[in-house]
From Swiss-Prot:
Record pathway: Amine and polyamine biosynthesis; putrescine biosynthesis via agmatine pathway; putrescine from agmatine: step 1/1
NCBIfam families hit by this protein: agmatinase, PRK02190.1
Reactions catalysed, as given in the entry: agmatine + H2O = urea + putrescine
Required co-factors: Mn(2+)
Alphabetically ordered keywords of this record: Hydrolase, Manganese, Metal-binding, Polyamine biosynthesis, Putrescine biosynthesis, Spermidine biosynthesis
Name of this protein: Agmatinase
Organism, as annotated: Citrobacter koseri (strain ATCC BAA-895 / CDC 4225-83 / SGSC4696)
């Protein structure tokens, strides 16, 4: 298999074990998995501090501290008893070739989705979401986007590979519908005419969680949803290990409650991106990312018990 290597993980920046100590499966297409975790160690599209290629490894490493809890608080059940989740390791591509990464990731995602799997991906910088959206749109059609970030990433700078342009490109390619999409935690300059509903960090920090979730549900409706979480949505006090930190963000507590509140949406794909462990302190950024990823899986598992 050319995309993910052979029966061992030959990524230069990967772990030898899976997320939550889950089994590594380098042939996930023919497995009985419900959700497949894929690491995307890519940071060539970064405009700030590089190092996101080491994000997947950092998330997996710290996730071992989350694996022990079976009846996770406050869910009171074990996600692993309801979902079959496997980790297929990292996407392998020629470091330095952004186009190859994009094409291989899209092909990998298309193959998984065609086999009836769902994807949770770990970046890497946020550009990796664009090839994932392309694959998901081929399978599910135009989607709603629920996007946690400090930046809208809707900047039209003419650069093909840039972690600040994906959500300018995606609507133009018909991948997502901005009128049914929400960007949460924004606290940098953005174009107010791009069609997205923007819930900036000031209002997200001041409003009640239930009120925000009700608005998100109303905007998204019953559309298929792609959920993407850039870790710089969190305040640097909770996530210093990222490429473009911005003061004034969400607490980890608020972010977790918001993610839990998305359980009624028709989420078809998910990612957590922009962890750069070289700038982390005591692995708190990686831990936040791993915890948010785990909560994403729990909102999927909760539906299995309904």
């Amino acid at each position: 298999m050319s995309t993910l290597g052979h029966q061992y993980d030959n990524s230069l920046v990967s772990n030898a074990f899976g997320f939550l100590r889950l089994p590594l499966n380098f042939q996930p297409y023919d497995s009985d998995a419900d959700w497949v975790i894929t690491g995307v160690p890519f940071d060539m599209a970064t405009s700030g501090r590089a190092g996101g290629r080491h994000g997947p490894a950092a998330i997996r490493q710290v996730s071992t501290n989350l694996a022990w809890e079976h009846n996770r608080f406050p869910w009171n059940f074990d996600m692993r008893e309801r979902l079959n989740v496997v980790d297929c390791g990292d996407l392998v591509y020629a470091f330095g070739d952004a186009r190859e990464m994009s094409e291989k990731l899209q092909a990998h995602a298309e193959k998984l989705l065609s086999a009836g799997k769902r994807m949770l991906s770990f970046g890497g910088d946020h550009f990796v979401t664009l090839p994932l959206l392309r694959a998901h749109a081929k399978h599910f059609g135009k989607m709603a986007l629920v996007h946690f970030d400090a930046h809208t990433d809707t900047y039209a700078n003419g650069c093909e590979f840039d972690h600040g342009t994906m959500f300018y490109t995606a609507p133009k390619e018909g991948l997502i519908d901005p009128n049914h999409s929400v960007q949460i935690g924004i606290r940098t300059e953005f174009d107010k005419d791009n069609g997205f509903t923007v819930l900036d960090a000031c209002q997200v920090n001041d409003r009640g969680v239930d009120d925000i979730i009700a608005q998100v549900n109303q905007i998204v409706g019953d559309m298929p949803v792609y959920l993407t979480f850039d870790i710089d949505c969190l305040d640097p006090a909770f996530a210093p290990g990222t490429g473009t930190p911005v003061i004034g963000g969400l607490t980890s507590d608020r972010a977790i409650k918001l993610v839990r509140g998305l359980k009624d949406l028709n989420i078809v794909g998910m990612d957590v991106v922009e962890v750069a462990p070289a700038y982390d302190q005591s692995e708190i950024t990686a831990l936040a990312a791993a915890t948010l990823a785990l909560e994403m899986l729990y909102i999927q598992a909760a539906k299995k018990g309904e």
